[in-house]
């Protein structure tokens, strides 16, 4: 058994998809299948239940996953300790953030870190910010730039870097939404909305609708992430509540209008988060010290 076997096993346990894991680790699904089979043969236990629809961990697989995560983290820490014998930090940090945050907030943070530690490689992954905490807890990334959750797990630490404001936006093109906005009073019950799947923007629009006493809003679509919602609003499919940073950076922001609301929308905190135990790793500790 090699440490790369543990890494592949952990990745497959997270994706539960042979094709995704194979693609992201630059191998064919058949090669991945053979690698997992060799691991199972070595252990003498079946780790995954496979069929055409899903991949699921067995009871032994769940136990081995805990072992694999611990050993993989120990291996990464040991490698870093060996590198720390040199005067300058080097190695790799895995960082996650949204597409918008990658150019609205991340450049300033990375610029300073790279100036201090030019030999450290940043492996950046972008995606739906609502996934940040899940990726941190699953040890898929070391650090994440994301909104502070309402209930921060005790195993996670958060360092605030900004307050993020939000706006309710509407299309400018003639459509059902613009027609309804011209009515007095506005029939919010018939207004089409575009929701994020989850996250702070989803929480804020749901709170706003509750305050409007709209129990069953008309949801045109539910979209993962934020960046794809602005074009949908601009094309006339409905209203949406989004972070202003997302709206301002969208190439479609000239096709939408911000609505004036009776009550301002509560902003949320944006920051860097990581698992507390990650602060024992020299690279993460150095990154965290720079923030403070």
From Swiss-Prot:
Keywords: Activator, Amino-acid biosynthesis, Branched-chain amino acid biosynthesis, Cytoplasm, DNA-binding, Repressor, Transcription, Transcription regulation. The keyword Metal-binding does not apply. GO terms for biological process: amino acid biosynthetic process; branched-chain amino acid biosynthetic process; regulation of DNA-templated transcription. GO terms for cellular component: cytoplasm. The keyword Transmembrane does not apply. It is found in: Cytoplasm. InterPro entries: IlvY_PBP2, LysR_subst-bd, Tscrpt_reg_HTH_LysR, WH-like_DNA-bd_sf, WH_DNA-bd_sf. One of its GO terms (molecular function) is transcription cis-regulatory region binding. CDD domains: PBP2_IlvY. Residues 18-37 bind DNA. Residues 1-58 form the HTH lysR-type domain. Belongs to the LysR transcriptional regulatory family. This protein activates the transcription of the ilvC gene in the presence of acetolactate or acetohydroxybutyrate. IlvY is also a negative regulator of its own expression. This is HTH-type transcriptional activator IlvY. It comes from Haemophilus influenzae (strain ATCC 51907 / DSM 11121 / KW20 / Rd). The gene is ilvY.
